Amino acid sequence: MMAPSTEDPDTVVEAQRRGSFSKKKNANGWNKVELVDQCAKQMGSEDKQPGGGDVKTENDPSKNGLGSATSNFIQSSVPPSHQTLSNPLQLSPPAEASVAQQSGASQVFPTFQAALGASSDELLQPNATSSSTSSSASTSSIVPVVKFTNQTAPNGSTVATSVGQNVRLTINGKRVGRPPGTFKRPQNNAANSSNSGNDSDMMGDHDLTCRWKSCNSSFQTLKALVDHVQESHVQSTEQEHHAWRCEWEGCDRNETFKALYMLIVHVRRHTGEKPNKCEYPGCGKEYSRLENLKTHRRTHTGEKPYKCEFADCEKAFSNASDRAKHQNRTHSNLKPYSCQIPQCTKSYTDPSSLRKHIKAVHGDDEYEKAKKSRPANYSNRRRPDHRLAPPTGAMSHPYLATPNSGASVVAHSSVHQQNFINMALAQHHHNAQRAQQLMAATGNVMPMMDPASAAAAAQAQAHHQAQAQMLQTHMMQQAQIQAAAQMQAQVQHQAAMQAHAMQQAQMVLQNNLLGAQSLLSPFSPLLPPSRAPNVMAMLQTPPTPTSVAPMFDIMTSRAPMAPVVSAPTAPAPLVPAPVPASPVFDELREQMREVEPLQQQQQQEPMDQDLQDIRVDGDSDDEDEEEPRTPSGALLLPRGGNNGDGGFGGSGSSRASSGSGTMELSAAPISQNGSRASGSGERGMRSFLIADILQLAADFQNERLLSDVLDLAIFDTRDVRSLHNIYQVYIRAHKAIPITRRPLDWNETHQLHNLYHDPRFNRAEHQDSPAIRDRDTRFWRTIAEANTMRQRQIEPVPLDDDDEGYFDEMVHRVQNGRLNEQFMEGFESDDDDGFEDEDDVPGLGIAVYRGRRRVRREALKQANLDIQEAETAGRNVGGFGDEEDRNNRGHDQDRSFLDHYYPPMVVVVETESPQIVRDQEMMRQFEEAKKNVETDEIKKRAEAMQFGTSSSHHHTKTLLIQRALFDKTSSVRRSLLQFITISVDQEELRQSCHATSAPQGAHVVHNVVDEFDSIMRAQEDSNNRILLSLDIPAPSAVTGVSGSITHADNSALQLQQEQPTSSFSSWFPEDDPIYALPPPPPPPAPPRRRRSADNKDDSENIPKKPRHQF
């Protein structure tokens, strides 16, 4: 090794720290000097004569009273006289005179601080030379007290470090010298390959032999060996599935490598290849790894990029290994790497020092054994962090056996400081034991000292032991306090976790029970109960449990959590409420109820009699509600979806509940076994009774509707008996219309049902076929088109305008089962029903409610389908067939075949005053009503009305309407009820009228709704007869006839009106009369078909009815 320059003080200090050089210089340069412990060995060996006797010198220990020769190793914390700031490295003792002066001036206190870092074998050797006694005489002893200082780690935490526990001598905080046997030795094999050329690596045959598996091939050059290993073994096909494994004979690597380059670098250890050569002139160093070459280059450049990570240290190093050694030795003073060879207690701060110790002291054989005994996952590069606790494997060394190993775990913030304190205490405790052993082996030195010195030493030692015991007790108390605090925090955290788990278990239990009852959607959270669309559905739907009102009382979180086995079981299935008396379609319901399977019948409990007497309009759903229980024989439709077909596309699939005749249409295709797939989003469901669709087909003489609904019923109804009841209704509806084709008989229907429900039949493919999808699209579009018409649509009732919240309160009380007598009296009295006229009487709102319900039932049977009126509503010419103009919905000619059902038109020609028109129309109404009611009183009132006051005019109308209303044979009564139903809704006739081209000279066209300002007034006389006072504005909505009236200015009011195309014939009995209202009107006579021989003048302004053939 080259000697460092004398001008560089850092280099000199570093060399002195490594113990390789002394301060003196001779002609040969820097010379090595022996360390303190080596000098002690030499001194101990020279003290003995060959004969076994000791040499007595003039400096006998008995003369100066210093004790035995072991005091040579006594050191003092106070620098001796021969160690000064000007000469810190002078290890030789001064002259004898100075020793005598100093010994007489100060008292000597023996200490064993020098023995704390040395081995016991070296300390037990007796030394009695004159030089040793003189050296020991110049020293003064102190009490071995453990001191601690705080240093700042790189992470900002304070680390406790012991001071005065260094094994070797320290000068100004720096170590001098290295342990024996740690100097670098040359390799065992003298051959060193340079690998500078192709054929320059001439080595012996045994060194150039391939030891891969069972190869044993020999080569002349190193390059040939390396090429052979790379091509034949490393990168050959033997490495299957990229399992890079070294199979060199004697290799202790048992694991595979993650990449090929790692195996290539590893094999260089066996072949001796070192391709990375230093380019520095005159150096010639070679390395097998490139990172080692980069580290070596820094020795030439002087670069030191690895700085010490402690804040108060400015040291820098050329490689990370030296920095780690410095931090472990200087800042932590821990020795976690201990020698595992028996009877060896050496421990070191880094693994490299341990390896050097094993090679130098125990030999290469022990090193190879220790190397092979390492675990498979051991890595030389894994070094412990000096800021953390030592590794677990190091705890087996006696140095690291803490005296309070049973203490509790301390807090996280002080774990590092506590570990370092414990390690320092452990080292001091072990060193004290070793010192006591040394005293027992060499003899007690206390009698050899003067009494004052012995007393002071004993007092200092007792004081030190008391301090150590006090520190240990304090640390144990602190650890116990911290452990108690941590235990309390853990108990609180555990209690919070148990409470949270209890809440979660409650929610999971409730959700599982609700899911088992099919009352909770898996895609939506618990929702509060919502209003039912009508009383019929409300009475059939059981109350839905929610988080606010669950099905049963859930245990509170304050009670301890019960075990899973003691969880409450699911309650009994909810039994739906019985259907009230006289439901809609009693006959059909009875038939469906008779053929229901026994397993679907549930025992029903009798309900309160007050609920059975309540009859509310079934179409009072004014907001989106959850799906109620569908009545038997109902066809369900999805709501929403603007797909150009009014929300009824043909891509949906239907499902039938067996036994009930219920068909449901969903947005997802059905599976092979008929179950409905779950769709995305919220689906509001409304229902059509199958009889409603059949009635609709009969009303419009549409045979295609009959066949389609029967096909859907066959496909979706699994129960044959339910299908047979539907087929009977189909036959009865088929007889009511003129047919062009033969209907299916029951045998054909049964065969088609067997085909659809055969396990081998692919229902999904059939449902997704283009023909069926087109059929479904047209079918549901027609249903939506029919319900879009205002005259036939069952619309929700404006509750706020009719009864001022009475109906809302009634529904709320019925839903919750609380309907007392006081509320019933208030509901029947109906003090304020919303009518703002001065003649308002109690009960008018309820009476109008019931009458309108009866009239509307004739239009469409309980159809609960909300159709949004927009430009994109599914309006097409004819519903079926002619769909070319379906995108031209804004034109007048693009109208459905339903538009001719109620198309009233009022064409006013050269009119001057609307009041004149109304008066003339009133006269015409009077003349029409007078044909059926001929009384003297009415004639007198009519004559007085023509020329009398307004009061007589009003009284005459009242008598006229009163008589006509209670005359069951009167046609005015039938029209009057229709007008009451239509006029209550504010926009009933808005879609019923359209303007046509007026004759020449016409200057205004009036809309029926804008011109008709009808007001209903009711009075209840002593005979409980309802008197309806009504201003009848136009004949189109009352009588349904056409005509023209000419007033005084010869201006004509031309009224043109078409009759409905079919009758409102019903196949099932209706409800019983309620509140003494008249029974529903009989169906009107079917209109006469228009022929070409009819009046052509009247047919010019009347739109022609489209004919639809299928």
From Swiss-Prot:
Residues 1076-1086 have a biased composition (Pro residues). It comes from Caenorhabditis elegans. Keywords: Cytoplasm, Developmental protein, Differentiation, DNA-binding, Metal-binding, Nucleus, Repeat, Sexual differentiation, Spermatogenesis, Zinc, Zinc-finger. Its main location: cytoplasm. The lineage of its organism: Eukaryota, Metazoa, Ecdysozoa, Nematoda, Chromadorea. Only isoform a (Tra-1L), is thought to bind DNA. Zinc fingers 3, 4 and 5 are the most important for DNA binding; removal of finger 5 almost abolishes DNA binding and prevents the selection of binding sites. Belongs to the GLI C2H2-type zinc-finger protein family. One of its GO terms (biological process) is central nervous system development. Pfam families: Zap1_zf1, zf-C2H2, zf-C2H2_15. This is Sex-determining transformer protein 1.
